[in-house]
Amino acid sequence: LDFHAEATSEKGAMGWFLDGKVQAVWGTHTHVPTADCQILPRGTGFVTDLGMTGPSRSVLGIKPENSINLFMGGLPRRYEEAEGNCKLNACLFTIDTEKKRCTGVRRADIQE
């Protein structure tokens, strides 16, 4: 289950709420990968946030100067996608389809 939420506490609570009801819960939205891959007591694989896929030298995928301008009090302007090598943040969940439980979860991060 992909749970798109801002707060890590929301994602953690959802993981525990769904433990044993689904095979895996992963959070998305913050674009920052977390290092908390685990299997909850009733067999649900969980990670708070997968991270992002996109340009490595960026602020959430956009040119850093766009983000700096916004935070320094500049007028909002159209975001421009950063260029260059990309990264992939992910998790691999191993599922026992007969028992309907997660038996393994690990990060899979690739950076060019």
Language-model-derived ranges and their functions:
Residues L1-S9:
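Short acidic, glycine-rich surface-loop motifs adjacent to enzyme active sites
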Residues D2, W26, C91:
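Functionally constrained cores in energy, signaling, and assembly domains
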Residues T8-E81:
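Conserved beta-sheet core of the metallophosphoesterase superfamily
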Residues S67-E112:
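A short C-terminal boundary segment appended to hydrolase-like catalytic domains
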